[in-house]
Amino acid sequence: RLTLCRKLVQPIQEQFRFLYKEDMEKFNKQKAAYERNKKKDANLIAPKQPRPKMLIIPANSSATMVYQILSENDGRGLMFETEGDTLANVFSSDYGNYSDGFRKAFHHEPISYMRRKDHEYVELLEPKLSTVLSGTPRQIASLIPDTENGLFSRFIFYYVDFKLTWLNVFGSNKEDSIDGIFDTIGKQVLELYQHLQGNPQIRFCLTSRQKDLFNCYFRTAQHTYHDKLGDDFIASVRRMGLITYRIAMVLSMLRMVDEKDFPELIYCHDEDFECAMIISKVLIQHTERVYTELS
């Protein structure tokens, strides 16, 4: 359930809302004081209204709005959408086609745009946008009509086969529901996020052995899939290498969830590296299946 995944970051979203509410209360007091005293002192400067920050970006937003939200959140954002055609419909519209922004954000490449209201030129130097979608094969085809424009290779896919099984929804009497469990994990994610925000920049590295295993696997995979599917699939293999590295990075940070201070240099634990590689090998098989259906 995609809604459960959202629970993992919902506490961070709520923290953003709380901080914005505090900023607005402070702004309203400053504005009231300004209105009372501006006639007495011509040198008074009007307070600037704070802009809301949000981690989770609505997928049906216009391109300009998506970039604006990213800009106001230091270039970071997430999207959760249970219907893949929501994003596909936005991409097919005149106002909402930000698929180029998706492609750039994957590699943290700069995105620039103009604010309509004040004609301000804005640059997102290192955008970081992650998206989680669920949908049917037809919805994927409407979102990514071809596999050559670069958007396909920037997604990872997990294909869930249909099973004709009726689940007994009354079968569990456990006090802790799965929603409650994910709520608890979400609070732990918030704590980890807060600790990371308070630490200096952290460098993540693989060991020499891990690098050798990584290069050996993807070198072989590149030739295997090239012989199997041709040139167009190579971008997916190569970007899967970067995705695998990022998965290993996330797993390494989750291992340190109870730490209060983080070292400036973190080496990947062997278990986390092996898990990332296993996940990657499964994902590339699913990516191959989706690629074959779209081609």
Q: What does each model-identified segment do?
A:
Residues 1-295:
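Phosphate-handling catalytic cores of nucleic-acid transaction enzymes
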